[in-house]
Amino acid sequence: MTNIRKTHPLMKIVNNAFIDLPAPSNISSWWNFGSLLGVCLILQILTGLFLAMHYTSDTMTAFSSVTHICRDVNYGWIIRYMHANGASMFFICLFMHVGRGLYYGSYTFLETWNIGVVLLFTVMATAFVGYVLPWGQMSFWGATVITNLLSAIPYIGTNLVEWIWGGFSVDKATLTRFFAFHFILPFIIAALAMVHLLFLHETGSNNPTGIPSDADKIPFHPYYTIKDILGILLLVLFLMLLVLFAPDLLGDPDNYTPANPLNTPPHIKPEWYFLFAYAILRSIPNKLGGVLALVSSILILILMPLLHTSKQRSMMFRPFSQCLFWILVADLLTLTWIGGQPVEYPFIIIGQLASVLYFFIILVLMPITSTIENNLLKW
């Protein structure tokens, strides 16, 4: 009798994706982040579901309902902090996953890469609308500032902002629709992740060398299932350390003050995972220019396959490109730091230099360096 996992219509799909999937024998721990993102998404959906049972999306009661969850609901505090810090873990895994793709040339899988960029945008949108829900000072002013950026779009900008707000300012209508968006988007993310995997399994995984690995494949189970479980255990350990010992480490103290439209906080800033983009936005003194730079900073990922001029796929054997890659990482860390600083000297000029360097490395230096390395191969 044939094994049920190979014949049953549903089990067959699971089997081909997670059990009998032929995987390269040499993929490193940098390939763990895909499964970790899946775990993060499931964790966020589950904790979010339980939070939604007790949350009310009304300006009068939203802040109180979050307080009620933390104080009165059984284990509400741990669910709330797992959800808040789970978002941070999600973004850490996302940035590592994208960084891995850039370093090892995984962007040559065009469909997989482009769906991935769409996923990144969707997760960022979800995190943004989610941050508004507790209705603290930073929630309210973050929502006001970021949605206001759309008014920079010529002709339709103002109408667009008022349409999103559902009125002439961030108010009850805004909070209610943001809750609706925050509830539906994770399921859209889950669907997109399925498509992401579908396209990946059309080609098979990349590997650190960037060389086709068809001649040397091993089954996903047990080799990579056990490896993924180790990654998941480490992720959960790190998340629970955050949740149980420093739950507010990555949050903003201003968000423990209820939203007040009449009182602007001295420094409006988003969560840490948006600070690099926020720094790029602030480094341009023109509103529309800033918005374009902000969008371009993420959208530039779509251009990566076009900017790939090297004869080698991976950076594994390209020391000059490796140096540039790590300079880019350092630049992004600098931008993240600048995004959380006040708008004054010397932070303004550092932010502007870091923003220019970010685009210059990706658009100019990387393709030139790859071409130089191609010529060095002839020596």
Swiss-Prot record:
Heme b b566 binds at H97, H196. It is found in: Mitochondrion inner membrane. It comes from the Eukaryota. It is a multi-pass membrane protein. The chain crosses the membrane at residues 33-53, 77-98, 113-133, 178-198, 226-246, 288-308, 320-340, 347-367. A ubiquinone binds at H201. GO terms for biological process: mitochondrial electron transport, ubiquinol to cytochrome c. This is Cytochrome b. It comes from Cervus elaphus.
